[in-house]
């Protein structure tokens, strides 16, 4: 997605202090992407839901380390959003966190169904390649915008 869904913090602004300004005390943190997930874990901002694929900028990598995480795997081919992926995302929201969805394929577009199905107090974070970190506070306005994007993709 070329246009960020939320606030874009440039690489040098994406520190813990700036990120905390966009979180509330009880925010349900969701990360999409290995680097974003790793960064939040390093900042001790443990994502309730993490969606990773073990790849960063087309290079294979180890998924971020975190103990006591429930892990679910799902197949999601590049440039697609499968119904299986949507079902797994919905299921993850009903599980005790932290939950990690390990994607075989590509996780990038899963930001969209996450924004639709995330709980009210959610904040979704994902990387904008070569630009920085996108922070999306889930609101009905965001849900409607994302639904319009999904409708265009069908």
Curated annotation (Swiss-Prot):
EC number of this enzyme: 2.7.1.237
GO molecular function terms attached to this record: GTP binding; kinase activity
Reaction catalysis annotation: 3'-dephospho-CoA + GTP = GDP + CoA + H(+)
Residues involved in GTP binding: 34, 53, 107
GO BP, sorted A to Z: coenzyme A biosynthetic process
UniProt xrefs under InterPro entries: GTP-dep_dephospho-CoA_kin (IPR007164)
Domain of life from the UniProt record: Archaea
Family: Belongs to the GTP-dependent DPCK family.
PANTHER family, alphabetized: GTP-DEPENDENT DEPHOSPHO-COA KINASE (PTHR40732:SF1), UPF0218 PROTEIN TK1697 (PTHR40732)
Protein's recorded name: GTP-dependent dephospho-CoA kinase
Organism: Nitrosopumilus maritimus (strain SCM1)
